[in-house]
């Protein structure tokens, strides 16, 4: 059995992210070991109101959340990341890593 399990999902709303992280939390618990890492970002030129909600969910439901860039389109990637971070409660901030470069964010998680 591999010590690492990787799941890829296209959760692009707060409801979808909540569902996938809840399922993954149960999967980690069933394995009896490991931690849940979430690597995600929000696309640019899309609904900005979901960004802080998704940041809050990722920080709350993951052991570690890596916030990264995800197709910023015409927006500044750092602005998107800052809007995601705005939803992270101070007590969860220590669980969050910022890595704007998506490839580096994934490498850091695995």
Can you say where each PLM-predicted feature lies in the sequence?
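C-terminal helical cap/extension that packs against the catalytic core
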Residues: 55-109
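Nucleotide phosphate-binding/pyrophosphate-handling subdomain across enzymes
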Residues: 1-64, 86
């Amino acid at each position: 059995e591999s010590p690492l399990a990787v799941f890829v999902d296209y959760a692009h709303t707060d409801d979808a992210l909540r569902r996938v992280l809840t399922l993954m939390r149960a999967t980690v618990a069933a394995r009896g070991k490991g931690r849940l890492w979430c690597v995600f970002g929000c696309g640019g030129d899309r609904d900005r109101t979901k960004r802080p909600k998704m940041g809050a969910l990722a920080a709350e439901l993951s052991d570690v959340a890596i916030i990264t860039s995800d197709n910023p389109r015409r927006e500044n990637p750092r602005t998107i990341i800052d809007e995601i971070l705005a939803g992270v409660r101070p007590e969860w901030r220590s669980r969050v890593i910022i890595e704007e470069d998506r490839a580096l964010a994934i490498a850091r998680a695995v």
